Amino acid sequence: IIEGYNQIDSSKENKLFISGVDNTFNSEVVLINMLNFDQEKVECCIEVGYLSKNTYENALETRYWALEKKINSILLITSTLHMPRAEFLFNQLSGLRVTPHAVNNNQQVIPFEKMLEEYIKLVISKMVFIKKYEI
């Protein structure tokens, strides 16, 4: 979230969409009070999506948001570990031009189990699309 906020330029033409947020998330409390984001910047430039529960749904939720806003390209910000699968799904589902921007999640060493889990999810995602769309 902080990296996305930092990408909003001073002209405030860039928008930050945070998808897959829990229904209890209060943007004013978290973004303004806890993270000390500028209230004016939050109000003009940050929107929150509460509908998605996984990466697949994040891509769809972002697609609908972008269509509504007439946006055709996005900067996809997520962790380095999660980026390959997120980028794949966003490219397959969103219909947007996707530029990846991976951020380090402050872990010096990522546990092997976590890397394996993410790799398996990526392989399964690709298998689903190959089977479903015969790509």
Please tell me what each predicted stretch does:
Residues 1-115:
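A structural signal for short, hydrophobic/glycine-enriched beta-strand patches
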Residues 111-135:
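A transmembrane-helix-recognition feature enriched in membrane-embedded lipid enzymes
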